[in-house]
Amino acid sequence: MGFEDDPYRDVDGEPIVDFDDFGNDREPSTEPLQDFDEDLADDIGDWDGEGSQTPVYDNDKVAKPRKRLVKKSSSERVTIDVPELIDEDVDDAEFDEFMGGRGGGSTDYDDKVGRKRKKEKERSSSGSGKEKRHKFPNRGERKSEEIDEMWKSIAHNPENDEEGVRTMDDDNFIDDTGLDPSERYGGDAGDRSPTHYPQAEEGEDEDEVNNLFKMGKKKKKTERNPAEIALLVENVMAELEVTAEEDAELNRQGKPAINKLKKLSLLTDVLGKKQLQTEFLDHGVLTLLKNWLEPLPDGSLPNINIRAAILRVLTDFPIDLDQYDRREQLKKSGLGKVIMFLSKSDEETNSNRRLAKDLVDKWSRPIFNKSTRFEDMRNLDEDRVPYRRPPVKKPSNKATMESRDGDFDLEIRERKTGLTSGQSSRGDRQMTMRPEATPLDFLIRPQSKIDPDEIIARAKQVSQDQRRVKMNKKLQQLKGTKKKRLQATKVSVEGRGMIKYL
């Protein structure tokens, strides 16, 4: 038999690969893991070398093998920390005893391990320029290094309690130079804690806190007594009255009256304050407003801004006309006449005219005891005296009387001839009478047949009936959808009428 064609055997027929060296996947391997660890250590040591262990050859067989170029850095070479896999502190003798106890005699694996250990010893003993092989630290050394690092981090922590170097700021913090030693803070008199001076420490903190809280608060307004308020109101009213008189004088001189326009902001601000409105009413502010609103001496109205501002102020002004004093004050001031004039003036704007009409309605009803209820208005109509037209006087016909006096002789002549005046007038003249309107003055008012309560009840009933009709329609629709007529249909053999089922 020839083994030339078998790729897994050599020329002598021996197998190229010994399958006994490989373990079964299903069975646990009995070989130790030290071989893998040693190979890994060798590989790491080889990486620390200068060149690569795998030379690159050119296609030319004559050329020498060239090594890969490795760029050397100026900094120190960094060693790689590989996690601990085996404990190298175990002596070679113990390892040999362990291996001998397992298998007995020497094996190929033992030879390999021995050769590798010799190489390691040679590398460590050689004094060449190559760096020594990195030795993996054991567990004890690693723990000690971690503890040292921990203590170093604690020592360099800025939050530690160690006392640092004293600076000038520390000296100036509590400056007790020039004081009696017994009064110094923490001096020779004994240890003193900050609680020994509670007033000084707490006082400063409280001041800072109070200042922070006071920043957002408004200052409390000082309350004035009634005498001061009355004096302030009198001064303001005097100033405003002088302003109105100055504008009237400027208008007589033909100059522009702008003083009231300048003081308008003061007027609106002062009269807009609720706490001062009652005081202004007591001092007769309605007369002042009448002087500001009335036409100027040349008949022109004041500025439109003045009129609009005063009308808005009067709308919100608390004039209680239920009180007798307030009603009399409003009547004597003459302000109502000016407001009535503005409500009917064609020169006034629509908005101001509307405000004036609202004021007239609001003030006139309490003064004239008018009611806004419809029933009261009906009673007023019934109590009112009906209007009667004066009797029409027939004009006396003086011309006919004169003609009759002049025709006296003619009448005598007619009598002689046997004709009366009536016959002659009828035959000779055609008279027409002007129709006169009969006076339609009714004395008895017809009774109203409209009952408002009945109308309201009828409207409610109609609305309820409409709702009921809508609900009945909806119920009928719901009932109609449920009840579907099921009728048997005749199926045609020819397929007629089947389109409806598709």
Swiss-Prot record:
Amino acid composition bias (Basic and acidic residues), ranges on this chain = 1-12, 138-151, 181-194, 401-417
Under the heading InterPro entries, the entry gives: IWS1/2, TFIIS/LEDGF_dom_sf, TFIIS_N
Keywords, in A-Z order: Brassinosteroid signaling pathway, Nucleus, Phosphoprotein, Transcription, Transcription regulation
**GO CC terms of this entry:** nucleus
Name all TFIIS N-terminal domain ranges. Answer: 287-370
Whether Phosphoprotein counts among this entry's keywords is: yes
In which compartments does the protein localize? Nucleus
Give a short account of what the protein does: Transcription factor involved in RNA polymerase II (RNAPII) transcription regulation. Involved in transcription elongation. May function at post-recruitment and elongation steps of transcription. May be recruited by BZR2/BES1 to target genes and promote their expression during transcription elongation process. Required for brassinosteroid (BR)-induced gene expression. Required the for regulation of numerous nitrogen-responsive genes in roots. Acts in roots to repress NRT2.1 transcription in response to high nitrogen supply.
Protein name per Swiss-Prot or TrEMBL: Protein IWS1 homolog 1
| Species of provenance | Arabidopsis thaliana (Mouse-ear cress)
What is the name of the gene encoding this protein?
A: IWS1
